[in-house]
A protein has these predicted regions:
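C-terminal region of N-terminal signal peptides and the immediate post-cleavage residues
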Residues: 6-7, 16-32
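Short linear recognition/processing motifs and adjacent strand/loop elements at protein termini
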Residues: 27-182
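Bacterial N-terminal signal peptides that target proteins for export
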Residues: 1-9
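Generic structural signal for short, solvent-exposed loop/turn connectors between secondary structure elements
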Residues: 1, 15, 90-92
């Protein structure tokens, strides 16, 4: 019993003298250090550079969708919506997931002569996202009057970012990354 009291006294003295002190409180950090939000993101005017493809990929902290264009990306709108709406008709497009992003590229899916540059065979599944942590479905919502829309079904309303990158060649890419967690 005396040894226990001696150890407790020594421990209390060490804490009191600052020899044993708790580490500094760390600032709250977001998942993977991502500082994204879930509010709408929009930029720029219309482009005549047509959409040529849509693809997806998985990363450690997020899932990624890439829209390829045959020229520079000039504008886009990406936002969470209650329903994905088809361009021109106003019809609702069914999209799997508990939340939906409507990705509108300010560019057509046809060239200046009206020739189709992007016409996916499976409009309800532009990319197979089975096994992705965040993505649930990627659907084509159409191209109308110079705008091309894609519906992105996700697991929940999660933070996202939008990037534009030049290349390859004279083309460019619109990138939508959606985090796995907050």
């Amino acid at each position: 019993m005396k040894k226990l009291l001696l150890w407790l006294t020594a421990l209390l003295a060490a804490v009191g003298l600052g020899i044993l002190a708790p580490g500094p409180a760390s600032a709250a950090t977001s998942y993977c250090g991502l500082q994204w939000g879930s509010l709408a993101k929009a930029q720029g005017p219309l482009s005549t550079a047509p959409v040529t493809s849509v693809r997806t990929g998985q990363h450690y902290c997020f899932d990624r969708m890439v829209v390829d264009l045959n020229g520079p990306v000039k504008g886009y709108t990406v936002r969470y919506v209650p329903e994905v709406i088809q361009d021109g008709s106003g019809f609702t497009i069914p999209v799997q997931g508990r939340a939906r992003l409507q990705v509108t590229v300010n560019a057509p899916s046809y060239d200046q002569n009206g020739n189709v540059t992007y016409n996916p065979a499976a409009k309800a599944e532009l990319s197979n996202v089975a096994g992705y942590q965040t993505f649930r479905q990627v659907v084509y919502a159409g191209s109308f009057e110079g705008y091309t829309s894609i519906g992105l079904g996700v697991r929940a309303r999660l933070p996202f970012r939008v990037l534009t990158l030049d290349g390859p060649g004279s083309g460019s890419r619109l990138i939508v990354d959606v985090a796995h967690f907050w």
